[in-house]
Regions:
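Bacterial N-terminal signal peptides that target proteins for export
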Residues: 3-15
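Start-of-helix register in tetratricopeptide repeats
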Residues: 81, 115-116, 150
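Alpha-helical segment of the N-proximal tetratricopeptide repeat
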Residues: 78-109, 120
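A structural motif in tetratricopeptide-repeat
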Residues: 76, 110-111, 145, 179
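N-terminal signal peptide c-region/cleavage motif recognized by signal peptidases
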Residues: 23-24
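Gram-negative and organellar
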Residues: 30-71, 88-92, 100, 119-127, ...
């Protein structure tokens, strides 16, 4: 008797598969590269804006050689008068090796000026980055003569550089109030003092940015578009079953992102901070793929010349398709260390407890722990190279959705000096899931690649609104290829306002 054949849709089987799609890390948690980029951009922009306030006060590396007048060098005799003048001029012209040598000879002579010695030692300590020691020397100097204006100004500068913002503000304000408006020299000094006071005010101002613009994406549903037909034999007959995933969904919409940050100095290096990140997309005629993320963080902050620490509670809220997807309370900490004038290291860590809003996703409830390490290296001609590693441990009630993720990031940035800058960075992450899935008959593992290119054009800014172009490519390769592997492209053109 011939066997009966028929084609049967896999509609019933796709019901659990549609639930499994929610275990995609892209839907489980906020875009890691985006949140990292926005967090790291906050510090960079704050430093750039501060340098703009102080552009006329930054050290000049083109100072003339010591005691060179009209191209002729003059020798310095071994006496208090000539050595004292040489010490002062070498400090003024930032000739630190000369200054150290002349100061050693000067202080070896009996009757040397203790005020000049303290002033020079303070300047040398500051040049070497020993700001606490420099502060001690300048305070010794002012203990000898409290109204010595150069000493007061240098102490205020050291407090500023060492991030003792409250004390520095008081010092500059006292200098400003003591200057005579009718004195031409005081007017020049007053401009310097005002620049530092503006920079100090800016440190405690609300700082942020907001960008919005059109976006196009070609695979909103992260579909592999796979189709496979196989034969299943049963006691009732033999069936041809087609297993197919939907076509990739493309759409236009709006892409947006914003940051808001504030730090308040309390005393010395200590303060408190508040920070918010907002980013997401909203699509025309495909609102079920809309996604938005809000991350708030506040707590304790410590700043000095070489280190920044921040630690405190965080709250994250995510929506998909205009409906709440999850909320997550947690803790976040970071450490920024300036290794040198051209090299910086940042270590970030966060822990959050994710609670999904719908019972259908409650099996995904669980905690996420992440650590990110990033190193920046400034290169000649305004190039910057950066890279890092990250580790994420995701737990959930459903062990088949829990995973350990290891990542590597690498990027390069270039300021072209013509009002245009560009950033290109890539990330590679490998996920190993915790448990075997009986539904999928496999233990899931994935490799994910992401590439992002950002082009900004400040020279085209209108009313300080800067256009930027962002191009992204994302590729996921899964051992469960037919369900979880996909490619995704997006391009957006945003207008950004900083404040």
């Amino acid at each position: 008797m011939p066997q009966s054949y028929c084609k049967r849709s896999l509609t019933l089987h796709l019901v659990p598969f549609s639930l499994l799609m929610f275990s995609s890390p892209a839907l489980l948690a906020a875009d890691q590269d985006t949140s990292l980029r926005l967090n790291q951009t906050i510090e960079y922009r704050a430093n750039q804006q501060e340098r703009e306030f102080l552009k006329d006060e930054l050290p000049n590396d083109t100072a003339a050689p010591l005691l060179n007048i009209d191209g002729q060098d003059y020798s310095v005799g071994n006496n208090l008068d000539e050595l004292g003048r040489a010490v002062y001029l070498s400090i003024e012209r930032q000739q630190w090796l000369h200054a150290k040598d002349y100061l050693k000879r000067y202080t070896a002579l009996p009757g040397h000026d203790l005020m000049l010695s303290a002033y020079a030692n303070g300047a040398l300590a500051r040049a070497e980055g020993n700001l606490e020691q420099a502060e001690d020397y300048y305070r010794q100097l002012l203990a000898m003569q409290s109204d010595f204006l150069p000493g007061r100004l240098e102490l205020a500068r050291v407090l500023f550089e060492n991030r003792k913002d409250r004390e520095s503000t008081v010092a500059f304000q006292q200098i400003s109030s003591s200057l005579s408006p009718s004195d031409a020299q005081a007017m020049g000094l007053g401009k310097t003092v005002d620049s530092f006071l503006q920079a100090l005010d800016h440190r405690e101002d609300w700082q942020g940015s907001f960008a919005i613009g059109p976006i196009w994406s070609d695979n909103l549903n992260q579909s592999s578009e796979s189709s496979f037909t196989y034969r299943m034999e049963t006691s009732e007959g033999t069936y041809l079953i087609t297993r197919a995933l939907p076509k990739a969904v493309s759409a236009h919409g709006a892409d947006y992102e914003g940051t808001l940050n504030k730090r308040v100095a309390i005393s010395g290096h200590h303060g408190v901070f508040m920070r918010s990140l907002l980013y997401g997309q909203a699509y025309d005629k495909q609102s079920k793929y809309n996604e938005g993320t809000l991350i708030n963080n506040a707590g304790y902050s410590y700043h000095d010349a070489r280190n920044q620490y921040a630690f405190g509670p965080s709250f994250e809220f995510n929506t998909i398709g205009d409906d709440a997807m999850y909320s997550a309370w947690g803790l976040r900490g970071e450490w920024i260390h300036n290794l040198s004038a051209t090299r910086m290291f940042k270590l970030e860590g966060d822990y959050k407890d994710m609670a999904y809003k719908h019972d259908i996703n409650s099996n995904l409830d669980g905690d996420v722990s992440s650590v990110y390490a990033t190193l920046w290296q400034a290169l000649p001609q305004q190039w910057t190279l950066f890279g890092g590693v990250d580790l994420t441990d995701r737990n959930s009630q459903d062990r088949t959705a829990a995973y350990l993720q290891k990542g590597l990031r690498l990027g390069v940035a270039k300021d072209f000096g013509i009002g245009v800058s560009a950033v290109l960075f890539a990330s590679y992450r490998k996920r190993q899931y915790d448990a075997y899935s009986a539904i999928l008959d496999a233990r899931r593992n994935e490799d994910e690649q992401s590439y992002t290119f950002i082009l900004r054009a400040p020279r085209l800014a209108v009313q300080d609104i800067v256009p930027s172009l962002t191009v992204k490519y994302n590729k996921v390769q899964s051992n469960i290829d037919w369900l979880y592997s996909y490619d995704k492209n997006s391009i957006s053109l945003k207008l950004e306002k900083q404040f």
